[in-house]
Curated annotation (Swiss-Prot):
The gene is infA. InterPro entries: NA-bd_OB-fold (IPR012340), RNA-binding_domain_S1_IF1 (IPR006196), S1_domain (IPR003029), TIF_IF1 (IPR004368). GO terms for molecular function: ribosome binding; rRNA binding; translation initiation factor activity. Keywords: Cytoplasm, Initiation factor, Protein biosynthesis, RNA-binding, rRNA-binding. Belongs to the IF-1 family. PANTHER family: TRANSLATION INITIATION FACTOR IF-1, CHLOROPLASTIC. This is Translation initiation factor IF-1. GO terms for cellular component: cytosol. The keyword Transport does not apply.
Amino acid sequence: MAKEDVIEVEGTVVEPLPNTMFKVELDNGHKVLAHISGKMRMNFVRILPGDRVMVELSPYDLNRGRIIYRFK
């Protein structure tokens, strides 16, 4: 899948789940299941409930995503 095919949206982390998964509520009200991207995992970026994040969604499955950025 090419980088141009993804959908990037902003949201808020609602709750942490096991295995670095998070429930994220998007700005449009949808809730998605998201995991941390590899670069964030390598740099030990901490994500807590209430954090604003950028989530990358695949057009094929809009219920799962990847957290690619945590806003300061």
